[in-house]
Regions:
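Gly/Ala-rich beta-loop-alpha elbow adjacent to hydrolase catalytic centers
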Residues: 111, 115, 120, 124
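Active-site-proximal beta-strand elements of phosphoester/diester hydrolases
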Residues: 205-208
Length: 238
């Protein structure tokens, strides 16, 4: 039977002076995330903004937190350094509820980019509000290197040899680790945290990069397949 994987929504908020559909609150999914999950024959369900998260956690086999808007600094006890970095508190609250519900149901959770930051904040961690060297308009073409932590889960998946290339676009980054989290990878050469994993029961793992954007033709690139397979295997093993 195909696995049923929930994906948290990106939110588009109505803009002043907008017309038509842009006057509405929109829940949406970046299709590359769906394609990545569909490549392993999983069924993909975007979870709309709602108050029934426990029911979704009961019915679905796992959760992926997709990328998108900043985490509001208010979520980790800080004020935004700039007004435009206020983030999306509505989405923050909803995704924290999702992480809590799926974790309580012992369902695996995988965070991508913003999802890694959200998991860290949900567990009491903090963020660097601005990391300009990791922010770029190149979007899914921006590549930098990461080094996997020796002995980590990712090192067991991929081996520990040398820096590996990933697609990573963000201007926030994990600062202080949340509860029961360990570092799985760091950016090279600046050492920012790029991947985390829970040391507690169940599967809770997150990467700051975008595995769904990986280029299979890049010989030095980190193949997204093993990470996806590990997550889906955790969903099957429940």
């Amino acid at each position: 039977m195909a696995l049923k994987i929930g994906v948290s929504p990106r939110l588009f908020h109505p803009e002043p002076g907008a017309r038509g559909v842009h006057t509405k609150l929109l829940d949406y999914l970046e299709h590359s995330v769906a394609e990545w999950l569909l490549s392993r024959e999983a069924l993909v369900f975007m979870i709309p903004l709602n108050r029934r998260v426990a029911q979704y956690a009961a019915e679905l086999d796992g959760l992926v937190l997709q990328g998108g808007a900043d985490i509001s600094p208010l979520a980790y006890g800080e004020e935004p350094l700039k007004p435009e970095w206020a983030g999306d508190p509505m989405r923050d609250r909803f995704e924290i509820e999702l992480v809590q519900a799926f974790s309580a149901a012992r369902k695996p959770v995988l965070g991508i980019c913003r999802g890694a930051q959200l998991i860290n904040v949900a567990l009491g961690g903090t963020l660097h509000q601005d990391v300009p060297l990791h922010r770029t308009d190149a979007y899914d073409k921006h590549i930098h290197e990461v080094v996997l932590e020796p002995g980590s889960g990712l090192a067991r998946l991929y081996g520990e040899a040398g820096p590996r290339r990933v697609v990573s676009i963000h201007h926030q980054a994990i600062k202080r680790l949340g509860r029961d989290l360990k570092v799985e990878a760091r950016s090279h050469p600046d050492g920012l945290i790029e991947a985390i994993r829970s040391t507690g029961p169940g599967y809770l793992c997150a990467v700051q990069w975008h595995p769904e954007f990986g280029d299979p033709a890049d010989a030095r690139g980190l193949d997204s397949g093993p990470l996806l397979d590990e997550f889906l295997d955790a969903a099957r093993a429940r």
